[in-house]
Amino acid sequence: MAIIIGIDPGSRMTGYGILQQTGDKLTYIDSGTIRTDTKEMPERLKRIFNGLTRITQHHLKYADEPIYTAIEQVFMAENPDSALKLGQARGAAIAAMVALDLEVSEYTARQIKQAVCGYGAAAKEQVQEMVCRILTLDFVPQQDAADGLACAICHAHSSHSMNKLILNSAMRGRGASKKKGRWRLTEEDLGNLR
């Protein structure tokens, strides 16, 4: 089991989605947006950092399983100023997760859409619809929140993520030992990973 926090960064609105992954089953936990209504960029970044920190700390309190985070990579915008602001918002989000000692994985918008919709150029509405179907939601999340959930779904479906879950399970259940910051697996553990 694991908790996955997906983040869709934005300088005016940052979306987040939180899922629980048990094997190949995904369960919705929470989603929403962090709005930054101020014009001053430093204040926006502070709100993103503080908002994500509070939300994550709340879920860390109740989580018995590992927590992973995933964030959408910056795309190349036609307007350089927009790309710079988006990069700063993304940096604030990553800093919030790293400050809580969480690992951050990054995915392109195309990878996220491909994982959720099966088509890398899917429209935002298609992403929203597929997020609802995959998580069997009885409501439609706001677009930025749906994008955060989509990012979490993408991470859950990535082979990198699945391998980590298998490895964590193997280490906890089979006598693996930690020595000098490295895990030592038994031959049986290594066989289970294949």
Curated annotation (Swiss-Prot):
<dbReference type="GO" id="GO:0048476">
    <property type="term" value="C:Holliday junction resolvase complex"/>
</dbReference>
<dbReference type="GO" id="GO:0005737">
    <property type="term" value="C:cytoplasm"/>
</dbReference>
<dbReference type="InterPro" id="IPR002176">
    <property type="entry name" value="X-over_junc_endoDNase_RuvC"/>
</dbReference>
<dbReference type="GO" id="GO:0003677">
    <property type="term" value="F:DNA binding"/>
</dbReference>
<dbReference type="InterPro" id="IPR012337">
    <property type="entry name" value="RNaseH-like_sf"/>
</dbReference>
<dbReference type="InterPro" id="IPR036397">
    <property type="entry name" value="RNaseH_sf"/>
</dbReference>
<keyword id="KW-0963">Cytoplasm</keyword>
<dbReference type="Pfam" id="PF02075">
    <property type="entry name" value="RuvC"/>
</dbReference>
<feature type="binding site">
    <location>
        <position position="8"/>
    </location>
    <ligand>
        <name>Mg(2+) 1</name>
    </ligand>
</feature>
<keyword id="KW-0460">Magnesium</keyword>
<feature type="active site">
    <location>
        <position position="8"/>
    </location>
</feature>
<dbReference type="GO" id="GO:0006281">
    <property type="term" value="P:DNA repair"/>
</dbReference>
<keyword id="KW-0479">Metal-binding</keyword>
<dbReference type="GO" id="GO:0008821">
    <property type="term" value="F:crossover junction DNA endonuclease activity"/>
</dbReference>
<feature type="active site">
    <location>
        <position position="72"/>
    </location>
</feature>
<feature type="binding site">
    <location>
        <position position="72"/>
    </location>
    <ligand>
        <name>Mg(2+) 2</name>
    </ligand>
</feature>
<feature type="active site">
    <location>
        <position position="144"/>
    </location>
</feature>
<feature type="binding site">
    <location>
        <position position="144"/>
    </location>
    <ligand>
        <name>Mg(2+) 1</name>
    </ligand>
</feature>
<comment type="function">
    <text>The RuvA-RuvB-RuvC complex processes Holliday junction (HJ) DNA during genetic recombination and DNA repair. Endonuclease that resolves HJ intermediates. Cleaves cruciform DNA by making single-stranded nicks across the HJ at symmetrical positions within the homologous arms, yielding a 5'-phosphate and a 3'-hydroxyl group; requires a central core of homology in the junction. The consensus cleavage sequence is 5'-(A/T)TT(C/G)-3'. Cleavage occurs on the 3'-side of the TT dinucleotide at the point of strand exchange.</text>
</comment>
<keyword id="KW-0233">DNA recombination</keyword>
<protein>
    <recommendedName>
        <fullName>Crossover junction endodeoxyribonuclease RuvC</fullName>
        <ecNumber>3.1.21.10</ecNumber>
    </recommendedName>
</protein>
<comment type="similarity">
    <text>Belongs to the RuvC family.</text>
</comment>
<keyword id="KW-0378">Hydrolase</keyword>
<dbReference type="GO" id="GO:0000287">
    <property type="term" value="F:magnesium ion binding"/>
</dbReference>
<keyword id="KW-0227">DNA damage</keyword>
<dbReference type="GO" id="GO:0006310">
    <property type="term" value="P:DNA recombination"/>
</dbReference>
<keyword id="KW-0238">DNA-binding</keyword>
<keyword id="KW-0255">Endonuclease</keyword>
<keyword id="KW-0540">Nuclease</keyword>
<keyword id="KW-0234">DNA repair</keyword>
<dbReference type="InterPro" id="IPR020563">
    <property type="entry name" value="X-over_junc_endoDNase_Mg_BS"/>
</dbReference>
<comment type="subunit">
    <text>Homodimer which binds Holliday junction (HJ) DNA. The HJ becomes 2-fold symmetrical on binding to RuvC with unstacked arms; it has a different conformation from HJ DNA in complex with RuvA. In the full resolvosome a probable DNA-RuvA(4)-RuvB(12)-RuvC(2) complex forms which resolves the HJ.</text>
</comment>
